[in-house]
């Protein structure tokens, strides 16, 4: 049986869009992806062309997530670099 197609939105913050080479990235819209049900976060990011590193933090629908989280239809992924200031 074929896996169902799902839609996922990926939003990039802290310059990840520029690091990944997205010169026309719209932070209000993010990146919309159509992919297979059950795909893991790491594969979503690779498929989208998002450059990842050990410092990047990920959230799925507002909850912190790791690379092995399975995605569902309608999920929104937020990718952020650590911020510092003071």
Name each region found by the language model:
Residues 1-85:
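Ubiquitin-like/PB1-type beta-grasp interaction modules and other compact soluble beta-rich domains
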